[in-house]
From Swiss-Prot:
GO CC annotations on file: cytosol
Record's function text: Cell wall formation.
EC numbers on record: 6.3.2.4
SUPFAM superfamilies (alphabetical): Glutathione synthetase ATP-binding domain-like, PreATP-grasp domain
Full protein name: D-alanine--D-alanine ligase
Listed GO biological process terms: cell wall organization; peptidoglycan biosynthetic process; regulation of cell shape
Similarity remark: Belongs to the D-alanine--D-alanine ligase family.
Enzyme class: ligase
Cofactor, free-text remark: Binds 2 magnesium or manganese ions per subunit.
Reaction catalysis annotation: 2 D-alanine + ATP = D-alanyl-D-alanine + ADP + phosphate + H(+)
Domain (ATP-grasp): residue spans on this chain: 103-301
Length: 304
């Protein structure tokens, strides 16, 4: 049915460890179901493997950019070889990996997203200060092309600004300074053009950082995260956000709901979400009675 399947994992991005966990989980399911599945670690290895091992399709769980699988580079490689693959194509992957350009598309279409300023990694102290004055505290500072909360800081006062900028500047590309929306953090998974039930994330610490996402055992996940009326609203918004940047197949849209007003604000799109025991897409799918094995199968079926 599927032929020989490459499970693309690992790579050299800042999200390598998460990708390895995701890939091993996917690989285990496929092999258990009798699929001839083999792991391939990173983009250079995939280029060689497509020639030597003649894979029929690729299950992409390579996270991040610059050695990852969410920036359009690996999608272009697979298209050049004519090999079907899971997830978004070149355009959708490249655009959604860039948080600044994604926000520009959303704003042009009238979709709600927090106010922001983009900064180069060489931005002067004066430029950084001007951005803060425009947005007002509190702000979030993050690399524009990383995921998994890598390099992200919440800043509430001027004295912590320099440290936050320095942390984000360790990574390639622009920096994104964004208005911090206080309220509930939610995520909506997309599968086969359908929005799955939202998940409201309740970390035990101050916010949903890398530790809360992948290491902590006390982070709470409420699914569905909203009442029926709000669920319908956030589902429509997430699908619009997903399609507006050219995404397809499966993915995840992260959203904040402002405390008090109840307004939704789009944060980012993930085109190759995690598939670990802590990951959110499997949690949302399970709410509909879909186990992890069936979820993996549904995603791979998109390549047929």
């Amino acid at each position: 049915m599927f032929g020989r399947v490459a499970v693309l994992l690992g790579g050299t991005s800042a999200e390598r460890e998460v990708s390895l966990l995701s890939g091993r989980n996917v690989l285990e399911v496929l092999r258990m179901r009798g699929v001839d599945a083999q792991s391939v670690d990173g983009v250079p290895a995939l280029a060689q493997a497509l020639v030597e091992r003649r894979f029929d399709r690729v299950f992409n769980v390579l996270h991040g950019h610059n050695g990852g699988g969410e920036d359009g580079v690996v999608q272009g490689l697979m298209q050049a070889f004519g090999v079907p693959y899971t997830g978004s194509d070149v355009l959708g992957s490249a655009l959604s990996m860039d948080k600044v350009r994604t926000k520009q598309v959303w704003l042009a279409l009238g979709l709600p997203t927090p106010r922001y300023a983009s900064l180069s990694v060489c931005a002067t102290a004066v430029e950084v200060r001007k951005a803060v004055e425009m947005l007002g505290f509190p702000v979030i500072i993050k690399p524009a092309k990383e995921g998994s909360s890598v390099g992200v800081s919440r800043v509430f006062a001027l004295e912590h600004l320099e440290e936050a900028v320095a942390l984000a500047a360790r990574y390639e590309g622009e920096l994104l300074m964004e208005q911090l929306i206080e309220g509930d953090e939610l995520t909506v998974s997309i599968l086969d053009e359908m929005a799955l039930p939202s998940i409201r994330i309740v970390p035990q610490g101050q916010w949903y950082d890398y530790n809360a996402k992948y290491l902590a055992e006390d982070t709470q996940y409420v699914c569905p995260g909203l009442d029926d009326v709000a669920e319908a609203e956030i589902a429509q918004l997430a699908l619009a956000a997903f399609h507006s940047v050219g995404c397809r197949g499966w993915g995840r849209v992260d959203v904040m709901r402002e405390r008090g007003s109840g307004r939704f604000f789009l944060l980012e799109v993930n085109t190759a979400p995690g598939m670990t025991t802590h990951s959110l897409v499997p949690k949302a799918a399970s709410q509909l009675g879909m186990g992890f094995d069936d979820l993996v199968w549904r995603i791979l079926e998109q390549t047929l």
